[in-house]
Amino acid sequence: MIPQQSKAKQVAITTMVAAMYAILFYGSAPGMLPGFTLLYLPVILLGVFPLWFGWSGLAGCMIGAFIGGVYVEQVAPYAAWVESITALIIFGLNWILIPRNAVENRTKRNLILLMVVYAISLFVGTAYILWQYTYLFSIGILAFNILAGFSFGIVLAATYGLNLVIQLVVCPVLLRTVTPRLKSWGVYSGNFAEWRKLRAKY
């Protein structure tokens, strides 16, 4: 059974997640186009935090993404919300689409399902952020073109491919090894269906 978390624990989780997200965002800085990180290490968190921390994790990821957009990519605060929306898209799709069995039953079928969800959510999120930043540049809100002279398709393929490999390699291992311990500590949220079921009981 997944326990209900106290407000204090939820706030602590949100703060911790935001800090970790911002730190990994900073670690992505070497792989940057002007104002945009090709290498996006926070995808690791977006692949596991939905199941681990639920709403608290989502809030932390959106805050950390905004901080990273402003201080790492040097995007103006009035445009850095794009980073938060991207985190929301990827986090939300993973939270909704990852089946519970993908974590509990370690079979090839469940691993494939998990990887398919990662591939879909990351593609949607990557395509969104590139489109949104390109659009903001075209209407004069963003001062620089993140494509840096490359075509949209090339930047999308490079960004998506690089980060998908990272997510597919790291996230399943983290889910398999860390999840049992988090459950024993009472901080595991489960997928969206599990979270809703828990909320209905209280």
Description of each model-found segment:
Residues 1, 64, 171-174:
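Extended hydrophobic/Leu-rich segments
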Residues 1-59:
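Hydrophobic transmembrane alpha-helices
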Residues 12, 16, 20-23, 63, ...:
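Lipid-exposed faces of alpha-helical membrane segments in multi-pass integral membrane proteins
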